[in-house]
């Protein structure tokens, strides 16, 4: 019999119960007993809802108080020395150790006077919008079983009568995700010390009556060096003698050159992602022995659309012919990346809601597909397949999805639409003459502090308690304050502060046709931080101007230059749930045309500088380098399409906030923004090496202070950083600005830091 299973399930709860409990605990409003009770209730509810959906083998170990990689670090005893005082008397970690590692802690390792030990680094989980805590390894790293959570949860699930499959991050993926600290060394040197602890974990699980364990090894979808491939063989040969059956789970891409390795590992089963890489199925069917289990991920774990059951079933039937009862059905990856339950959405348009599926509904789709293999004539199977066909046809034919005007406009785009009228060298001369800015011009990235007054006004307006006129007055008051502060500080190019914006994507998405919004479509970003991405369901267009009135008002308050502030097409796309029926490239082009219209309206309103933020530009890179150039080509083209309609004298800025430029510097240059502002202060300007080596041709504003900290930098520090930048970039092409927007900071530290920043620029002009 084919079997239905999940690789993982969301942990936050349908009403974000985990987020609320965590934040209450951190504030001291909930004790640890209460927090643990919430976790236990969520786990029980999630196991039950999956079981009721028809999932036969339930994941255990997918629950985490903050992040699954952090939980695994505690399990293996990988706890940086600076957090040792947060452990118990026996030297073992506690829940507070876990939170200290995630959030930082005071008075660790002999620190006194409230000094905070910094948290572990947070970074993206492969190419998703989830973030994990990066393990820190030392050359003398020791591993020991130190955290009982997994075993306790297996007991919990067994007590409730569930058949479970514990989920572990595989040893090679775990080492790959970590960073070497202190002396440089090869992380693979740690493998032989790590494997005995995995063996101990497997022994404990076997003693609990577990039959199958899932090893998540998504690094098998990456470009792996040969020594890592060899290490895979060594690791799994070492673990093959444990009494448990092992399923190696790969996802987020195809196995490609790692297929031979994955197919011959001494394990009992292999999971592959057929959503991201459907083309790999024939090769896997050819290479994987039929006595092993093949788990096919046919339901998309990373998006919100209902599965095309007919299409998925065709692939499953092809595999079923060879693997028979050794075929398992699953999501493409953990459902962690999907919202929890569509049934909570009681205000969605019924037609649009019918096209969607969240984690609970995806679990049901997985079960139906498994049932279809085992009993194709069953009534529920026949009905589900018929309904799926109707829904897919409805969506494919809907006039709400397809807009002929948008499609015609896109078809009429020419190469000239992607080109500024003149080269940068000519444009910058005209712009400098028009703007008349001093050397080392000062500006900020866009947002100013979002105070409680701003948030309360926005909330009251959304709830209908504050009229549009009163809300507009409240936001204009905030804009006046932001402009006055900037003028008093002596900044050269001003911003309006973005008081009216709740989020840099959602604000624009709410004003574009082709987007829909949920009330409960939350997914975890990390810890207690959840995001509710907008959903692109149809062709995208801008019915009317989105920012012009606000920016025009701000410009009316000052004689200084006011920047228009927009979010770029790639970032809009990457931070939304996108369509599956058209390519990301097409969606980016549609967004680019909508933003182009806004840019031109701002120009017509007399705005001399327009900033188009592309914070997610690098995040869109595929996991395999061979696929990078195709992405970079269309991402650059989308930016150029939205930015290239303006006259030479209108200056286009872009902002990027990430820490690696070397491998994409040519593409960043190809965007042809007149000015790029970037995050560099934490790297002590080392990131500018990429711009120096490549001889980046346009203006640059390297961030001179870190906005993620409340610390106010001294003027001398910023002078030093700008001087360092000037050794790499000609001084006449340098701008002076913070690393990122100031939305999360308070006004006192913001003003203090900007006073020093302006002073630094003035000092350099002498």
Curated annotation (Swiss-Prot):
Which reaction is recorded as catalysed by this protein? Answer: 5-methyltetrahydropteroyltri-L-glutamate + L-homocysteine = tetrahydropteroyltri-L-glutamate + L-methionine
Q: Which UniProt keywords apply?
A: Amino-acid biosynthesis, Metal-binding, Methionine biosynthesis, Methyltransferase, Repeat, Transferase, Zinc
Protein's name in the database? 5-methyltetrahydropteroyltriglutamate--homocysteine methyltransferase
Q: Which CDD domains match?
A: CIMS_C_terminal_like, CIMS_N_terminal_like
Binding of L-methionine: at which residues? Answer: 445-447, 498, 613
- Tell me which domain of life the UniProt entry assigns to the organism this sequence originates from: Bacteria
EC number(s) from the headed UniProt entry: 2.1.1.14
**Which example biological process does GO assign this protein?**
methylation
User: Which taxonomic lineage is given here?
Assistant: Bacteria, Pseudomonadati, Pseudomonadota, Gammaproteobacteria, Pseudomonadales
Explain the purpose of this protein: Catalyzes the transfer of a methyl group from 5-methyltetrahydrofolate to homocysteine resulting in methionine formation.
Transmembrane stretches, start-end: none
Free-text cofactor note: Binds 1 zinc ion per subunit.
Q: Which residues bind L-homocysteine?
A: 445-447, 498, 613
Residues binding Zn(2+)? 655, 657, 679, 740
Q: Which cofactor does it need?
A: Zn(2+)
**SUPFAM superfamilies from the UniProt entry:** UROD/MetE-like (SSF51726)
Regarding protein family, the annotation reads: Belongs to the vitamin-B12 independent methionine synthase family.
Q: Which Gene3D superfamilies match?
A: 3.20.20.210
- MF annotations from Gene Ontology: 5-methyltetrahydropteroyltriglutamate-homocysteine S-methyltransferase activity; zinc ion binding
